[in-house]
Amino acid sequence: MNQFKATRISSLIAYLFMTLCPLVAIAQSGGTSSSYSRFGLGLLNDQAQGWNRAMGGVGVALPSGSKLNTLNPASYAHMDSLSFILDAGMSGNFGHMSMDGNSVNVNGGSLDYVLAGFRLRKGLGLSFGFKPYSTINYNYTTVDKEAYRDVVTGELVRNTTNYQGSGGLNQVFVGLGWKPFSNFSIGANVGLLWGGYDHVMMQNFTTDGESNSHFDAFNFIQHADVLTYKLDFGAQYAFRVSPRDWLTIGATVGLGHKFDGETFLYRFMTTGDTLSVDGEKDGLDIPMSYAGGIAWQHKNVLVLSADAHYQAWGGCRIPAMVIDKGNVTYPSTDRMYKDNYSLHLGAEYTPDPLATKGYFKRVKYRVGVSYSSPYMNIPQGTGGLGSSTEGPREFGVSLGLGLPISNRYNNRSMVNFGMQWLRRAPGTQSLITENYFILNLGVTFNERWFMKFKIQ
């Protein structure tokens, strides 16, 4: 029996890792389209899963039981001894961008996570999987309001600039959660962070809508390749406040450090001639991060939870293109970032988890809200080291359902469906306001692999 279990587990782990590469390609091919992904490391991906995205992204104080919770690795210690959990999720988004009376609609989709976990022994749980860390995906064009006079023909010339970007960072991780004594658990996630980005800026000078050959435009490509580690620690403590009520507190810490990566700036003319290549090694950082949470559970019917997150982006560096009197440089700077924080509130209600009749009595009803301050500064003009303004704040409202999948052997697998409204609102009218409607779909397979059957 033990040999059968070990073979089954090792075979599934091998299969999951073999399928990981094409899944990563799918994740990189889509994602939210946003002009703000041009700055910093792009849009930071929501690290919550389908079930807790519908609860506003809470999870620091929530344990893993019949589902995985990667927001706090200490939660893995609470996994059931009979279960192997496989969790996967994807999302589709429909966005509306507006500025100065102009607007455009965008849409996209992405694979958000593929995770697995099981209990190794009493009080010790293991989880591993794939989750994107950041996404870069944009393509937009600006036209200068003021025209220039062609010194040869005397005609008015306008400068049109196209900005395109793609890429992002992905992570694979493995984590352990351990419960050294009753009601207290600790854990750690160790991850590999890799990826890169390309930011392209192409200029074109036109006269009456046609290209003007008397102007040679400067064009730029910013390229980066990244390979580094990510390390996060967590703890949870639960105590009973009444015969039917539990209160859990949780905390996490993520280590900040320099990236092992290289970044390059390519500068070339419209004719295709390369003028210069400027590089920066180890010029990227990720921040120290801290989170705390509290959760109250009434029987198995009602859960209320609140989280607060803080990331020290203000001291992190990233190379920035600086144009000063015709001179182009590409130094690393910490002026592109600012410290950010986020707040999350969520609730889950299950009318009767043990109901044998009435399917909707076992459905989990979820709702949540969230707020996040910006982690990026938006440069004004052409200088990455000059004046800047804050990036957009994010406001979110979410709701969803956990729909049980039941059969004679298993009643803990679940389809998690959620809807989110997300608004990115800048502090100035000169920047773009974004509104998104997001559909999340996740499936949690909770299979009883380690149950012993008696054969008669």
Question: What spans do the regions from the language model cover?
Answer:
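Outer-membrane beta-barrel porins/channels
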Residues: 28-54, 119-456
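N-terminal, post-signal peptide beta-strand-biased segments of exported outer-membrane/organellar beta-barrel
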Residues: 26-134, 339
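Membrane-interfacial loop-to-transmembrane-helix junctions in polytopic alpha-helical membrane proteins
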Residues: 3-6, 63, 163
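Residue-level detector of alpha-helical transmembrane segments in integral membrane proteins
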Residues: 12-16, 66, 280-281
